[in-house]
Amino acid sequence: MSSSSGDCIFCNKKNCKVISSTKYFFIIRDTAYPVTKHHTLIITNRHVDDFFDLTKDEMSDLDEVLKEQKKQLKKLDEEISAFNVGVNIGKDAGQSIMHCHIHLIPRRKGDVEDPRGGVRGVIPDKQKYKRK
């Protein structure tokens, strides 16, 4: 779905301190529910619910935005040693704001005891596994 919603906090940029923008996206730091320091949200300018509905031009721009934000974040904080990139698509996957946004989560050595499994942790029983 891609119709604008009058009460969408991202369409209204409610409580959004925009740090950068492109033709297709605006970028903010997640200050409401950050997973780590400098957790970044890359949000579509147009109202579109589903990541899979992004256009080729939007996907191409997103690639550049992610690379640029990675570079900026590493300049901002030299302790950043890795990243998680995540998208929740649909309520059953945890999407709570029905406006497409991508999480860029900076990671630091030792920020969790055992980072193996990374995004597999969305289903806790699947995070730990042994390679075959």
Question: Which positions does each model-derived feature cover?
Answer:
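HIT superfamily nucleotide-processing domains
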Residues: 1-132
